[in-house]
């Protein structure tokens, strides 16, 4: 809004910058996928509907410290001290977090704590390097809280199929993009050829979200 652009126009500009980066690196992706792609929206709604039908999603009120730039909530102990004495700073952008409350839909991540530990034990080489694997294990062993997966305060996003007054939170919606890119929800044969024999290269600062 400050730049006189809609969210879609701003996202288009950002996507173009990423595509230019690939060209500079002489990398030609099979597909440059975005969360605004129509087939991704269809896949997200189908995926989350199944998760909802399986009883892993419920409604509750979320309250916490939110960073607009990160589009993420932080626990009190995750924020950095504010030298001005105000609200704590988010650890990435070092901007004051905002206290935020709203009714959201939640995913029962806590129910998957032991299954995740079992998966890591059965797949010791699935996450690397070792330091990052241990970091992920530490997060799980420290206890997993249920996570908010929707937002009612914005309309930029994929609408929730059973409650279109809310949209999916980007950090839940975007991760499904990996599956969409190889055919989930649109091309079953292609999806079966690729998944789960895939390798993800991610930034070390977003390990927690993944």
Predicted stretch roles:
Residues 1, 44, 70-72, 77-80, ...:
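Short acidic, glycine/serine/threonine-rich loops at helix termini
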Residues 1-58, 208:
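N-terminal Rossmann-like or analogous alpha/beta NTP/dinucleotide-binding catalytic cores
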Residues 4-9, 60-65, 75, 93:
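Basic, alpha-helical terminal appendages of large translation-related enzymes
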Residues 28, 64-70:
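Short, conserved phosphate-binding/catalytic loop or strand-edge motifs used
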Residues 34, 39-43, 69, 92-209:
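Structured secondary-structure scaffolds
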Residues 54-63, 76-85:
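Short, flexible, mixed-charge glycine/proline-rich loop motifs
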Residues 65, 87-89, 146:
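Cys/His-enriched microdomains
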